[in-house]
């Protein structure tokens, strides 16, 4: 049976710059590059500021994933390669927030939904990955409903605000500039709105979106081109855009601090980074990035240890159900192919009988219907008991028995079946993307 395999590059092993360099194309390019491979039958890509993950269904998963890792130029010491069972457990843990830098954060579940939907619209998913991802999304919701794992600092955005509070000893009376009004920027702004700060300024490439968020949270909208005018008055700048270049260069920051003596804290939560690293050499400027949020992550992990145990128990329960679902799917596929094979014989033999009878006398609709009902009933009665046995064998995990049945009846010609499905989908994939895909691409942009 062809199963799921995955390769994962995440904050656990990779530094910010290593994740940045993991892939330089767009999501369309990466998906098409994966899917055109002869031995990739299904694929999904998850790309966020903290991870690049590739899930494939392939009979030669190891060689396929190693070749993609080589193509991406990623060092194997920062990559985790997972087989089927490990991939399923990792995906469910990811959706539940257990693999996040901030354990229990909610943002990752939305990202999985969006990026899975993107791959599905692109036509690169099939029954195997769809089953896994739909289960993961369901489990992510269940964990958040049945535990308190998402209470407290539950996102990169709120962790950035907590980090700023730690550094300043509180944000009372501070002016904060948020650059970027995507999902992370909104989370930052919402976390800031709960603090006793002097003012929130929200800058974005699309000014209308900045206005909407500023209006909702009682802040001030800023055009992205005007941020130079607001930097001198800011105490904290938190930047998380999808830009392919630096938003704040050393030159811009140096100009902003000329006429001030107080500290300027810059927190860069973008991938690729928004702020040029050399700003740390400037006096009264402190730069933090995603790596610094590990401090907050460790603190949150201690707070949520008991809730994480409950989440782990849910995941193990759901893994068992998911594996049972896959076993049933295999049995159902064999049963479907067996019925199709026998029904093809039924139709041929029924037609032969009709032709023979027609040679003696005229056959009416009633006679044809009787022959049709008779042959169908015979097939269903003969296959009824084997169908039950196949389903029971699948639920008991008797793979050997299923394989024997498959070989005896020449069923489940997997490679041919997958290739036909894949070709039909690939023929439908057109250049460009839908409006919904374009929105996902902008939110999880992978820069050139």
Swiss-Prot record:
It is an enzyme of class 1 (oxidoreductase). Pfam families: GlutR_dimer, GlutR_N, Shikimate_DH. CDD domains: NAD_bind_Glutamyl_tRNA_reduct. During catalysis, the active site Cys acts as a nucleophile attacking the alpha-carbonyl group of tRNA-bound glutamate with the formation of a thioester intermediate between enzyme and glutamate, and the concomitant release of tRNA(Glu). The thioester intermediate is finally reduced by direct hydride transfer from NADPH, to form the product GSA. Belongs to the glutamyl-tRNA reductase family. Homodimer. This is Glutamyl-tRNA reductase. It comes from Methanosarcina mazei (strain ATCC BAA-159 / DSM 3647 / Goe1 / Go1 / JCM 11833 / OCM 88) (Methanosarcina frisia). The lineage of its organism: Archaea, Methanobacteriati, Methanobacteriota, Stenosarchaea group, Methanomicrobia. The gene is hemA.
């Amino acid at each position: 049976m062809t199963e799921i395999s995955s390769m994962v590059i995440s904050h656990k092993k990779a530094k910010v710059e290593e994740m940045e360099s993991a892939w330089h194309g767009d999501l369309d390019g990466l998906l098409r590059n994966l899917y055109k491979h002869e031995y990739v039958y299904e694929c999904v890509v998850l790309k966020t500021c903290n991870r690049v993950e590739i899930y494939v269904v392939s009979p030669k998963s190891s060689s396929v994933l190693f070749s993609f890792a080589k193509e991406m130029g990623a060092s194997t010491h920062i990559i985790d390669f997972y087989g089927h069972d490990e991939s399923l457990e990792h995906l469910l843990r990811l959706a539940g927030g257990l693999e996040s830098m901030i354990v229990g954060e909610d943002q990752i579940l939305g990202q999985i939904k969006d990026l899975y939907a993107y791959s599905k619209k692109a036509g690169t998913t099939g029954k195997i990955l769809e089953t896994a991802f739909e289960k993961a999304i369901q489990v992510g919701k269940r964990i958040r409903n049945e535990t308190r794992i998402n209470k407290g600092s539950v996102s990169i955005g709120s962790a950035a605000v907590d980090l700023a509070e730690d550094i300043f000893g509180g944000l009372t009376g501070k002016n904060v500039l948020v650059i970027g009004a995507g999902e992370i920027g909104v989370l930052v702004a919402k976390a800031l709105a709960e603090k006793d700060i002097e003012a929130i300024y929200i800058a974005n490439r699309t000014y209308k979106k900045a206005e909407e968020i500023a209006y909702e949270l009682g802040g001030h909208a800023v055009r992205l081109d005007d941020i130079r005018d607001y930097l001198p008055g800011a105490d904290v700048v938190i930047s998380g855009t999808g830009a392919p270049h630096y938003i704040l260069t050393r030159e811009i920051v140096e100009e902003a601090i000329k006429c001030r003596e107080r500290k300027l804290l810059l927190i860069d939560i973008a991938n690729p980074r928004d702020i040029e690293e050399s700003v740390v050499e400037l006096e009264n400027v402190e730069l933090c990035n995603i790596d610094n949020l590990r401090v907050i992550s460790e603190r949150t992990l201690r707070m949520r240890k008991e809730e994480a145990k409950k989440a782990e128990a849910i995941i193990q329960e759901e893994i068992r159900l998911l594996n049972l679902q896959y076993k049933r799917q295999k049995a159902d596929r064999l049963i479907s192919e067996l019925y199709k094979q026998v029904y093809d014989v039924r139709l041929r033999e029924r037609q032969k009988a009709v032709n023979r009878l027609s040679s003696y006398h005229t056959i009416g609709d009633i006679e044809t219907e009787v022959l049709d009902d008779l042959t169908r009933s015979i097939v269903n009665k003969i296959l009824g008991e084997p169908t039950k046995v196949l389903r029971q064998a699948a639920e008991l995990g008797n793979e050997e028995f299923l394989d024997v049945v498959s070989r005896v009846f020449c069923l489940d010609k997997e490679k041919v079946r997958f290739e036909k499905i894949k070709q039909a989908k690939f023929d439908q994939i057109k250049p460009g993307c839908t409006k919904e895909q374009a929105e996902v691409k902008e939110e999880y942009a992978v820069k050139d």
